[in-house]
Every structure is written in structure tokens, then in C-alpha cells.
């Protein structure tokens, strides 16, 4: 939500935006030591907590996502695994949105 905001969630969105700022600052500070710092920004993910929501709420969430479904925890894990791999060695200070296109 740090990338697009949401009504009634000022505190939550502000903390997420703070994490993005921290990520970018740490990337600059630690990059010279060979340390990369990145963030993953998940969209609506089908977690145990989300599964307990009423069906109409889940449908509303799906309707907001361009790919018309909620993400899976494994898809978030895959982004983290990529960032931890050698394939991402030159990626630094980046936020990867794993959100089905919500931030497009």
C-alpha cells in the first residue's frame, strides 16, 4: 500500500512507505560494502487471515487486481528467493511489487 495508499489506513501506509525509504537509504550506505538491500511489496495475498474474510470482501479484492485473483504466499517467497540469489547481485535499492499489477 505504500505505493498507492488506501483510505483509512494512514498509519499502516506510512510505515510501509518508511520501509521503502529505509531500503533505499540502506542500499546506498551498504552498497559500497557489497551488500544489496531491496524490498518486496506484496499485493493482496491469500493468507490464512485473508481466507477468513467474507466472500464479498474477497471478491472485491480480486476485482481490484488486474489479473483478477489474489496472490499466493509462494509467489511472495519466490521474489525473496530471487533477491537472495546470485541472479539479483546487481539489483540494489529496488522495490519489487508482487501484486498482480495493482500498482500499474
Task: Outline where the language-model segments fall.
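Active-site "substrate specificity/gating" loop of NAD(P)-dependent dehydrogenases
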Residues: 1-9, 31
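Active-site segment of SDR-like NAD(P)-dependent oxidoreductases
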Residues: 1-4, 26, 102
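Short, flexible catalytic-loop segment of classical short-chain dehydrogenase/reductase
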Residues: 3, 20, 41-52
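Active-site helix of classical SDR
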Residues: 15, 23
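A short hydrophobic alpha-helix cap/turn motif
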Residues: 30-32, 45, 71, 84
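Short, small/polar-rich loop/turn modules that mediate ligand/substrate recognition or access, typified
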Residues: 31, 36, 91-93
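C-terminal helical subdomain
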Residues: 39, 62-87, 91, 100
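A short C-terminal helix-loop "cap" of Rossmann-like NAD(P)-dependent dehydrogenase/epimerase domains
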Residues: 51-65
Amino acid at each position: 500500500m505504500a505505493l498507492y495508499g488506501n483510505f483509512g489506513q494512514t498509519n499502516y501506509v506510512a510505515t510501509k512507505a518508511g520501509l521503502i525509504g529505509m531500503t533505499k537509504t540502506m542500499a546506498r550506505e551498504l552498497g559500497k560494502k557489497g551488500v544489496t538491500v531491496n524490498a518486496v511489496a506484496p499485493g493482496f495475498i491469500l493468507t490464512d487471515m485473508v481466507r477468513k474474510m467474507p466472500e464479498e470482501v474477497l471478491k472485491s479484492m480480486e476485482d481490484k487486481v488486474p489479473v483478477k485473483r489474489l496472490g499466493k504466499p509462494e509467489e511472495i517467497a519466490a521474489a525473496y528467493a530471487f533477491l537472495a540469489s546470485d541472479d539479483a547481485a546487481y539489483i540494489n535499492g529496488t522495490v519489487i511489487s508482487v501484486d498482480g499489477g495493482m500498482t500499474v
